């Protein structure tokens, strides 16, 4: 999709999209990474303990799916997914990082990255890693500390 075609994709009002709204405000731990094309933050569960190692990579522009991305956005999403995956492995000791894209709940491109920790039983692999009772969980302070480590890794490893 060319830059001109991308500008012609219908845009939802920013206030109607929870991802657009979130990117304009504050998130627990702050953004892990952001530039003009992409944004990443650690997900925080306000209703209980948060699984440590769940980061979302999102486009800055309101684009519903991969089909609407410009070449520059597609490249930026892919590169950031790889960088954040490396950061999650280095900063959490995860032995694997899952990437999920569903695209049918919130129409703003976002990819879910989940760390899988050593010893995670196979029945809790994939989208169930956070359901394992022994998976690392924490509150706002632990999320903020992990975000700081992730930002540090990304700053020291720009590629």
Report residues per predicted region:
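HIT superfamily nucleotide-processing domains
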Residues: 1-159
């Amino acid at each position: 999709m060319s830059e001109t075609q991308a500008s012609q994709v219908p845009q939802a009002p920013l206030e109607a999209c929870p991802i657009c709204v979130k990117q304009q405000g504050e998130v627990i731990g702050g953004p892990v990474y952001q530039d003009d094309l992409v944004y990443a933050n650690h997900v925080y569960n306000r209703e209980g303990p948060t699984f440590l190692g769940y980061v979302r990579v999102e486009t800055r522009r309101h684009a519903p799916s991969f089909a609407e991305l410009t070449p520059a956005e597609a490249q930026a999403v892919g590169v950031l997914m790889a960088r954040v995956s490396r950061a999650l492995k280095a900063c959490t000791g995860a032995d694997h990082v899952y990437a999920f894209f569903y695209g049918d709940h919130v129409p703003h491109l976002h990819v879910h990255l989940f760390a899988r920790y050593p010893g995670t039983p196979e029945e809790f692999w994939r989208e169930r890693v956070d359901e394992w009772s022994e998976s690392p969980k924490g509150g706002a302070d632990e999320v903020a500390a992990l975000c700081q480590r992730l930002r540090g890794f990304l700053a020291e490893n720009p590629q």
